């Protein structure tokens, strides 16, 4: 079954190892085989992997687009996941979902789950910041 892709004007995407850049008009085409596909907005650059959750996303992305080096990325992934679970055990259900998708070699789905981890990580940071502000206000009162 074909995958229909519609690119907006000037949009870029990764198909396999090729970067595709669209021209001035919307373009539509079909992918006939199984190959890694990422839209520009889904691609995280290494310098953006600035938190543990973002590092997980980045490593899953690398597993997806560079399966030849899967083992290297997978080992690093587990190092980070262990640290995350030790620091924030409440992340375990999300990480379990990510791992389930990776085990099934559904890397795109694992990336979607990793987005949930990034969002949850931000919620934890925001909650910790709010708690810190509340504690400071209580001390100065």
What are these regions (language model features)?
Residues 1-141:
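Terminal leader/tail segments of proteins
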């Amino acid at each position: 079954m074909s995958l229909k892709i519609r690119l907006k004007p000037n949009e870029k995407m990764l198909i396999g190892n090729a970067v595709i850049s669209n021209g001035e008009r919307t373009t539509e085409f079909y992918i006939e085989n199984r190959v890694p596909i990422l839209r520009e907005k889904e691609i995280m650059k290494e310098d953006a992997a600035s938190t543990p959750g973002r590092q997980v996303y980045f490593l899953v992305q690398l597993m997806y687009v560079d399966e030849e080096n899967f083992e290297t990325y997978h080992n690093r992934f587990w190092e980070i996941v262990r640290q995350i679970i030790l620091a924030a055990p409440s992340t375990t259900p999300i990480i379990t979902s990510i791992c389930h998708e990776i085990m099934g070699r559904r890397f795109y789905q694992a990336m979607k789950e990793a987005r949930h981890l990034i969002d949850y990580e931000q919620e934890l940071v925001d909650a910790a910041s709010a708690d810190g502000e509340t504690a400071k206000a209580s001390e100065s009162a």
